[in-house]
């Protein structure tokens, strides 16, 4: 029988921005003694990880009773409530709607840039110029929009919600893609990102190439 008081197991990789969201929540909430982090071997034929999570995706959280939670939003929500003092949960009402709206917008940026980066890692003859062009254009539109949205009160403070956490994770994907030049012409977004970038939770979870 599993001990309900034993740590939950969080399966991650050190490259996934989605896993990074969960890793940041663990550090921000000081849950290190409640969460065992395990490096998963993904995108490998017959990886033992597929017996744990058939989809092979991260993050994946295994609860003491064996329940499996997948998808970063669900995993982060569970972790946020693990100490019974949720910090990242959107509030009720109009303010909560704003948080969810901006989180969705930040997630669109992160997902698109992630696809763009994956194309760059493919062999040259397997890359899709159409996908690269599409995701690059999407990123340009979203970054232009974020230059004004970053002034929204929801985006102020120090990683107080998932909209902020998701956006900075997306912006810091710049280190993997030299063509993701979002800093050019977006001074408010640059100031916002640079102000938060020295937080311990971000420094300790910098993706490892």
Predicted regions and their residues:
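Acidic-histidine catalytic/liganding microenvironments
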Residues: 29, 186, 199-200
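GST-like domain detector, emphasizing the conserved glutathione-binding G-site
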Residues: 1-129
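Residue-level recognition of oxygen-bearing side chains
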Residues: 74, 188, 201
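Short polybasic/polar patches that bind polyanions
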Residues: 27, 176, 198
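Short, hydrophobic secondary-structure boundary micro-motifs
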Residues: 86-91, 155-158, 184, 203-208
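Charged/polar, low-hydrophobicity segments characteristic of intrinsically disordered regions
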Residues: 148-150, 196-209
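GST-like fold's C-terminal all-alpha helical module
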Residues: 106-194
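Non-transmembrane alpha-helical segments in soluble domains
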Residues: 76, 80, 100-103, 143, ...
């Amino acid at each position: 029988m599993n001990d309900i008081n034993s740590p939950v197991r969080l399966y991650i990789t050190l490259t996934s921005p989605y896993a990074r969201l969960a890793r940041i929540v663990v550090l921000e909430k000081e849950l290190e003694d409640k969460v065992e982090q395990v490096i998963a071997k993904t995108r490998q034929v017959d990886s033992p990880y597929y017996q744990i999570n058939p989809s092979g995706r991260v993050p994946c959280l295994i609860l003491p009773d064996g329940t499996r939670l997948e998808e970063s939003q669900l995993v982060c929500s569970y972790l946020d409530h693990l100490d019974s003092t949720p910090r990242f949960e959107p509030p009720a009402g109009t303010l909560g709607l704003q948080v969810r709206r901006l989180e969705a917008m930040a997630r669109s940026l992160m997902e698109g840039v992630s696809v763009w980066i994956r194309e760059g890692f493919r062999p040259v003859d397997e890359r899709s110029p159409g996908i690269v062009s599409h995701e690059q254009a999407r990123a340009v539109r979203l970054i232009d929009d974020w230059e004004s949205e970053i002034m929204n009160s929801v985006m102020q403070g120090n990683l107080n919600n998932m909209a902020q956490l998701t956006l900075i994770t997306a912006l810091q994907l710049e280190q993997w893609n030299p063509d993701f030049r979002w800093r050019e012409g977006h001074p408010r977004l640059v100031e916002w990102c640079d102000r938060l970038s020295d937080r311990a939770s971000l420094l300790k979870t910098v993706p490892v190439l």
